Amino acid sequence: MRSFIHHLFRDKSVATMLLISSFIIGICALAPSLFVLVVLDKYLSSGITSTLISLAIGAIILLSFEFAFRQNRAGMIQALNKKIFQPIIDALSKKIKDTQLSGEEFKALEKAGAVIKGATNSSITGWILDWPFVLMFLIALLFINWTAAVIASVFMIIMMVLTAQRVNLNLQQDSTANLEIFLMGLMTIVILSVGAYKILECDCNLTIGMLIGSNILASRALQGANKYAKAKEAIKQRDRATAQIISFINKK
């Protein structure tokens, strides 16, 4: 992750804009869960149509802001990654043309170049930048439904460990995707079951709106943890490939 931070802050003005955009995206991402919470707990009890319309318009505006800032951030990330890694890829191509290589050496360098190209897309950097705000979802969960926060934290750890150990566990990509869907569904069942029990059996302030809203937040947090773990592994592969290519370029 040090290399990621180093690359990010090569252009401090762009890094600042990316962090600000990520903060706004994180705030706007709270809209669906807060909308569900307020509609179920406030509108259904009051029945005032103008309140529902105002809430719906507000939520749509926030989602539109999130989409716009994600698009803008993706463009900035692509420009930054191209500025950093395109010279390395160009230097590799030039060096390969000027050097006699065995078939195995050529394949290894070609694979390293493909790793760099694949790991420089905007999604990977965006997933890393979103991680602090995924933790913000957990903090919000603590205030809404603390049991959902605990359950989500456990599933996030499981998801991140499985993603990090995917190669050691010999999991294929399809199996990993199926496992992610299974964990997402299992977490929803656990959160709703525990929440329903608390509403009916315990003397607590948890409401149906808070329960459903907290489940949406927990799902976003789990997705964010999964994406962060994948991005972290991609960054590690990119660093190894970059080191391999630079070593080859500098070889006399």
Question: In which residue ranges do the predicted regions lie?
Answer:
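Hydrophobic/aromatic residues in alpha-helical transmembrane segments
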Residues: 32-39, 57, 73, 77, ...
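DHp/HisKA histidine-phosphotransfer helix
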Residues: 105, 120, 175-178, 207-213, ...
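A hydrophobic transmembrane-helix motif
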Residues: 30-37, 125-166, 171-213
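Cytosolic ends of transmembrane helices, especially the final helix of ABC transmembrane type-1 domains
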Residues: 221-248
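Membrane-integrated ABC transporters
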Residues: 1-31, 45, 49-54, 73, ...
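Extended non-transmembrane interhelical loops and adjacent amphipathic helices
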Residues: 1, 78-118, 167-169, 239-250
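Transmembrane helix-loop-helix hairpins at lipid-water interfaces of multipass membrane proteins
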Residues: 15-72, 143, 147, 193, ...
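Residue-level hotspots within the lipid-embedded alpha helices of multi-pass solute transporters
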Residues: 22-30, 63-67, 83, 95, ...
